[in-house]
From Swiss-Prot:
UniProt PTM: Phosphorylated by the catalytic component of the Dbf4-dependent kinase (DDK) complex Cdc7. Monoubiquitination of Lys-118 by Bre1 gives a specific tag for epigenetic transcriptional activation and is also prerequisite for histone H3 'Lys-4' and 'Lys-79' methylation. Deubiquitination of Lys-118 by the SAGA complex is involved in activating transcription of a large subset of genes.
Protein name: Histone H2B
Main location: nucleus
Gene3D superfamilies: Histone, subunit A (1.10.20.10)
Gene Ontology MF term list: DNA binding; protein heterodimerization activity; protein-containing complex binding; structural constituent of chromatin
Residues recorded as bearing N6-succinyllysine in the entry: 44, 114, 118
Length: 123
């Protein structure tokens, strides 16, 4: 038979239980968007035995965000100059050619074209 508790002790136990259930609700964490998993996948393709520190990953993430922002801004400017309201792959391609130097631009354009072709063929 369980030991009997006094009326006050039972009330206190009940209150404690209520407090736990009130404060027990988990706060929903806001997701941090990052290119970390994609940067890591590319790193492993290029150098399978190499790791990356969290600080280096943060720098790479900032770099990718910066480049994408620059490309988007340049593509927007190009669309505005040509009185267009839509940014197409053509504007993106031209923006890349304007922003990236020489051989890097050629490689970026060819990889981008390949990605767009793969995407449209999979539909």
């Amino acid at each position: 038979m369980p030991p009997k508790t006094s009326g006050k002790a039972a009330k206190k136990a009940g209150k404690a239980q209520k407090n736990i259930t009130k404060n027990d609700k988990k706060k929903k964490r806001k997701r941090k968007e990052s290119y970390a998993i994609y940067i890591y996948k590319v790193l492993k393709q290029v150098h399978p035995d190499t790791g990356i520190s969290s600080k280096a990953m943060s720098i790479m993430n900032s770099f990718v965000n910066d480049i994408f922002e620059r490309i988007a801004a340049e593509a927007s400017r190009l669309a505005h100059y040509n009185k267009r309201s839509t940014i197409t792959s053509r504007e993106i391609q031209t923006a890349v050619r304007l922003l990236l130097p020489g051989e890097l631009a050629k490689h970026a354009v060819s990889e981008g074209t390949k990605a767009v072709t793969k995407y449209t063929s999979s539909k």
